[in-house]
Amino acid sequence: MAYRFEVDRSNCINCGVCMDVCPVHALDMTRTLSPSIESGVGGSPTRDQQPWMMEFPIQSGECIGCELCSVECPTAVIQITAIHAPAELAAAQGPIRHGPESETGWAALSEYTTESLRELHTDPWGDLAGWRAARRQESWQVWRTWNTDGEGTDRLFAPCQEACPVGTDAGRYVALVGEGRYAEALGVAAEYNPFPSVCGRVCTAPCEPACRRGVMDEPIAIRELKRFAADHGMEGYPTPPPPAQRRPERVAIIGSGPTGLSAAYQLVRSGYGVTVFEAMPVAGGMMAIGIPEYRLSKQVLQAEIDRILSLGVELELNTALGRDISLDDLKRQGYQSILIATGATMSQPLGVAGEDLHGVWPATLFLKRVNLGENVTLTGDTLVVGGGSTAMDAARSAWRAGASSVRVLYRRTKEDMPAQHEEIRAAEREGIVIEPLVAPVEVLGRQGSMTEVRCERFAIVGKGADGRNKVAPVPGSTFTIRARNLMVAIGEAPDPSILPEGSSIQFGEWGCLLTDSETLMTAQSGVFAGGDVATGPKSVIEGVAQGQRAAWAIDRYLQGLPAARYVPLWRSRAPLPLTDRIVLDLANRERAKSELAEVSREDRHGEVSLGFAAERARAEAQRCLRCDVVTSCQLVEVKRTVSV
C-alpha cells in the first residue's frame, strides 16, 4: 500500500509523538533542505511557517498505513490516505498489532510491534532504551531554527522563549510551578531577568500570543505563572553566588529603570564595580514613577531593587545627568565605561491651541506626582488623550484621585489601541469610557483654566503598513466636551537636557540618542546608551533586554575584545538532559484568570489583580504542551481525555 501523508503545520505543536509511535521508522521530523522562496536559504521558513517549525519527511515506501501517528496526534493534524495498493507491498509489510492501552489511552513505543516474516514479534529497532532522546537529538537539534534575519542557531527553542525579549525559559518555570517547585521556578524566571515579580505583573507578555496551546484553546497564562513563582518561591530562592573573580574596572550607569538596573545586575555578576546614578528620590525609573501602585506594588518593586543592590551595586539618588554630574565628571572619577539609560520621560505635546491652560496635564507628570506620594486631588470631569498603557494608567489614577467622570479619547479604533486588552477591560470595569475615533483639536477655557475641549471625529479609510486602521477626519464633525482636566498621553521622548550643547553624542531625528546598532556605543568611546533613551518608549521587558545587551557590549569593551554580533546568552545554553516522563494534558479547560480585588476610590494603592491561588496555578501550568523539552525527553505521555 502506498499512502499520502498530510500535516496541517499551522496546528502542529512539534511534540514528536508521531515519530515515537511509528513502528516502522517511516517518520523523521527533520527540516527539509530545499531553499525557501523568500530567503533562498536551505531550511529557512516559508511564509506560512513559524521559524522553529519542522517539516515531516516521510519514507512513503516504509509506511504501512497503520495510522498510529494520526490516532495519537494530540492536535489531530495528521491525515493519511491510500493512493494505490500493490499486493506484494502489503503482503511484505504484514499486519500491525497495537500494544495494550494505558489509562491515558496512549501506549509507549515499545508496546507496538510489527508482525511480518522479517520482524516477527520484535520491536522495530531492538533495544529502545534511550532511543527517543538520542534520535530526537540527532533529528531535531542538529538542524537549525532560522530567525528572521536568516541566521541559524544549533538549537530549537520553544516559541514562548523565542518571543521573550530576554529569552526567559518559560516552559521550564511553568513546568516547575506545575510540580509545586516554586523556588526552582523563580530561579529559572530570574536567570536573565532581575525583575520576575515586576514582569509577572506588568509585562506585555509577548510569549503568550506565541504559545502553541492557543492553537488548541487558549494560551497558557505565562505572565501570571511568573508572578506566582516570584510571590511563592522567594523563601527558598538563594541569593546569586558572588562572581568567580573581581575585575578592577568600574562602570557608571545613569538611570535606575529596567535597562540600567538590568545592566547593573549582569555586570556586577561578571565581577565589575557598578554605581547607578538616579535623578529621582526613588530608584526604579518609570517602574517607580510611571506605573500606579494598584498595578505594581512599591513593596514588590523595592524588594527586587534591594536584591540587585545586595550583590554589591551602589546607588546614588537625586543625582541627575546634566544637572548634578556630567560624563566628564564620571570619567575623572575613574569610571572606565558609562551607560546612559535615562529613559524617555518627557510627554509629547498635543500641538493644539489652548494646551497651556491650567488643567491640562502631561500624563507622565500626573503619574509621577501620584507615585511619589503627593496628595493629588481632582474634581470635575476628566479627559485622557491616548491609547497606550500610560493613557490607561492616567485614566484609572484620575478616577482614584476623585474625578467625577473619566473619558479616554483615541483617534483610532479600540482594537488599534496599543494598551493591553486587560488594561482596557479593567478601565471599563471601573467606569471609564473609551471614545474611539475622536481626537481634540482645541482646548477652550476662561481666566486661564480649561473648561471644554473641541474635538472632531475620525473615520477608517483603509489599512496602514503596520496593519492598523488608517483614519481621516470627518468633515463637519466637530463637537465640544466639557471637562476640567485633560491628561495628554500620546507618547514620550528622551530629555535632551541631559547632554550639553556641542556634545559629540547626538540625538537623532526622533529624539533618541544615536548609537551603534550592534554595540550600543555612542560617538564617545566607552560611553553606551540603551533603553528608551536610545529606542524610544518600550515595555519593561524590552528595557530589561536592552540592559542585558548593554552589559554584554560593555563587558567586551572593557576586556578589549573586538566588536561582534550580539548573541544573547540564553541562545548558547545547552538543553537539559531529560529522562523523566512528560505528561501533555489536552483536556479542554479554560485558561485560568487572576482573582480581582474589590476596587474603591478610597484604596488608591492596593493591587487590583491578586494573582493565582496555588491550586489554580498548578492546574494552569499543567496545561503546558512542553514545547521546550519534547526534543530531548525519552517519553511523552498524552492524556487524550477529549478530542481536539
Language model segments and positions:
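Rossmann-like dinucleotide-binding cores of NAD(P)H-dependent redox enzymes
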Residues: 97, 276, 280-311, 315, ...
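Rossmann-like dinucleotide/flavin-binding elements
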Residues: 253-277, 316-328, 346-349, 365-421, ...
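Ferredoxin-type iron-sulfur electron-transfer modules and their immediate structural context
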Residues: 1-62, 70-247, 298, 340-357, ...
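A conserved short coil-to-beta-strand element within the FAD-binding core of flavoproteins
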Residues: 317-333, 437-449, 457-461
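Flexible glycine/proline-rich, aromatic-decorated loop/lid segments
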Residues: 358-363, 429, 455-463, 501-529
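Short gly/ser/thr-rich secondary-structure transition/capping motifs
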Residues: 231-238, 318-321, 362-370, 466-473, ...
